[in-house]
């Protein structure tokens, strides 16, 4: 029987104990450690080689891939283990895939941005398997009211780096401490419609096993969305990005507000890299 939590009228799933909880995060190394052994999760070559040695041949893999369920696609790509959870090996392989299939955006700014923003894409293990944490903005905000997004915000001069700005904003918005996260990779920058703001997205993993708290009035609600939900074709819809020629897939998932705009474009880049052909008719970013 699954343990569920009713919160703000929505169904929430408590995060469960997972295979990474036994490891601790080393701030100096920015990676996992257990006892006296430091495990480099950024470039875990041994794990990558192991996964590659046990892969199916590319041709037979592609034939069966088209008929697989979302979970089977994630497993066959080494993104999660057979139970649908994130492990050290699967996280290392995600980094490998995101660098191998690094997305590029066809839209380039014509002007230099004058403002900078950063968002964090928190990967966590929940009772529904590997999931991403997204927030819903307050309906009282002047911009992007009520929209779904990743935690983040404007880069301040005191932040020191774009990544730290994403960590700071995440803590202020939902209560996740910076040392809860292990950095995985960075995505190509995106730009607002007026090209004045550059947005950088950072993928990070957290072993946090309890629900965070909403720290400011900017966030109305938060959602743990399983990766399998994003890969379900029934939840996908082609959309056009802000009066441009850029097509992308937005997500309409049961009991979760519509995910569209820049947040959906970031998700497209991520999912298209770790599970090629898993989204419907998306452009090649």
Swiss-Prot record:
The keyword Magnesium applies. A motif (Nudix box) lies at residues 153-175. Keywords: Hydrolase, Magnesium, Manganese, Metal-binding. Its cofactor is Mn(2+); Mg(2+). Probably mediates the hydrolysis of some nucleoside diphosphate derivatives. Belongs to the Nudix hydrolase family. PCD1 subfamily. This is Probable nudix hydrolase C6G9.05. It comes from Schizosaccharomyces pombe (strain 972 / ATCC 24843) (Fission yeast).
